[in-house]
Amino acid sequence: MAGEGRVVRVNGPLVVADGMRNAQMFEVVEVGELRLVGEITRIEGDRAYIQVYEATDGIKPGEKAYRTGSLLSVELGPGLMGGIFDGLQRPLDRIAESVKSPFVTRGVKVPALERNKKWHVIPVAKKGDKVSPGDIIAKVNETDLIEHRIIVPPNVHGTLKEISPEGDYTVEDVIARVDMEGDVKELKLYQRWPVRIPRPFKEKLEPTEPLLTGTRVVDTIFPIAKGGTAAIPGPFGSGKTVTLQSLAKWSEAKVVIYVGCGERGNEMTDELRQFPKLKDPWTGKPLLQRTILVANTSNMPVAARESSIYVGVTMAEYFRDQGYDVLLVADSTSRWAEALRELGGRMEEMPAEEGFPSYLPSRLAEYYERAGRVIALGKPERFGSVSIASAVSPPGGDFTEPVTSNTLRFVRVFWPLDVSLAQARHYPAINWIQGFSAYVDLVASWWHKNVDPTWFEMRSVLVKILLREDELRQIVRLVGPESLSDKDKLILEASKLIRDAFLKQNAFDDIDAFSSPQKQAKIMRLIYDFYTNASQLLDKGLTLKKILEKVGSFEPDIVRVKYTVKNDELNKIDELDNKLKEAFDSLLKEVA
């Protein structure tokens, strides 16, 4: 132990202790007889202010505060996949077994990784090899989907003095020894890393490949790149959680980390019930084999909301360093900000806007800055990414409040949820007028190369139609649609088609829940062909009424495509497109 002090004051999750000379910021302290875990957030002389991550009921002045000399850290190694942890990375399933209670007992200590479970280790490095931070020295097939790569920790480099042969080992077994110029360092299957310190990498890259999610409005209208950042703000009942769950279920990421930060417990229960039954659309294996859940629900200690966000992003960086694309989903960062506000108030800090601490923007920036696509440290060379999608819950749907407005400064994709769309049963309720994505130009080349060379052009036409429809809506409200020209009436017709056939998506329909990029492009092609051909006929003097008499019957078929055509039956969409073109061609001949 690094020393101990005495508690002099208890104020909710904030404990003040004297006699803490030589303590460091963010050092872990165990408070009271129950040894409740806390973290030092302020030091004044030999007095430390400790943010305790468990309920402090019964802690009284005079009790001891034990310094540990270490920062709040997580265990990184085989056994994380498919696990459900609390905000301190304690495994909730094993805690339930040990305490025989539905609630987490205060002061309980259970390691994140199971100590007795044996893993089949295949070494890939040899004795005498020169190793440096990030080098892969062994592999473990953790699940059918994830090959866990054992990497040299960032602070270790030297000559591999010894490495264990292929066989079964626990995470505590020493599998290698590295000679660091006379100092021999033992390596186990797991390593520890402080959650507040970003893990190092070789080089940060520009994100150019889209993170495909199977949600059409996300992939096509407001795409996120691998290594990108996105925010989903929305008022109560607008569909934030279902949208985030859809991302977690269907996204192309190899590893998904879902952090439930201060949200309702039944939402995490939902995840645990659904994920084992669902199959990953990219591999056909159970989704839980690539998912890690961090549950810090609304009835758990407020202070641990902050640690749950950091625990999630540190685990994401670890899998990024192995060469995987990771998606971190956080629901919701507003609850974390509320925890910062409460603790700031208890520490008597000067409040800023709406009572939030003045350092809220810098904390949000630190968090989002840990996203990115990188070249990982070590050999062999590999690319990994951490993409972050976070919900924001502004009170009353006010996007000008501090958490939303500050988040907007740091994210490059904005998916605002509109309660009026949700009430109209339009899901996902992402407002296509307010939303934006800074990755459209970066990912366009991927779409052109792999899906459709006219993707950017078609998307631009769809977006222009939606923007023009928003302008026309005001005129229609005042004087009715009859006063509009045929060109503008066609805009209204096409925008209705875009909304019903493309933007709306049923997250609970077996076929519509996930749209492959090829299916998305083909549905977009149908709408694009409908609009551009009708527009040409209007230019040649035909009336919209005459055009719709001939081709209007195709509209219900275009809308039904998303429900009736599976991702491997796309030739049916081509057949419909050919029939549509034939109908337009016959109209063109009549005009001629």
UniProtKB/Swiss-Prot annotation:
Pfam families in the cross-refs: ATP-synt_ab, ATP-synt_ab_N, ATP-synt_ab_Xtn, ATP-synt_VA_C
Sorted UniProt keywords: ATP synthesis, ATP-binding, Cell membrane, Hydrogen ion transport, Ion transport, Membrane, Nucleotide-binding, Translocase, Transport
Enzymatic class: translocase
Ion transport listed as a keyword: yes
Subcellular location: Cell membrane
GO molecular function, one term: proton-transporting ATPase activity, rotational mechanism
A single BP term in Gene Ontology: proton motive force-driven plasma membrane ATP synthesis
SMART domains, per the entry: AAA
Annotated SUPFAM superfamilies: C-terminal domain of alpha and beta subunits of F1 ATP synthase, N-terminal domain of alpha and beta subunits of F1 ATP synthase, P-loop containing nucleoside triphosphate hydrolases
Record's GO cellular component terms: plasma membrane; proton-transporting two-sector ATPase complex, catalytic domain
NCBIfam families per the UniProt record, alphabetical: ATP_syn_A_arch, PRK04192.1
HAMAP family: ATP_synth_A_arch
Protein name per the record: A-type ATP synthase subunit A
Annotated organism of origin: Sulfolobus acidocaldarius (strain ATCC 33909 / DSM 639 / JCM 8929 / NBRC 15157 / NCIMB 11770)
Gene designation per UniProt: atpA
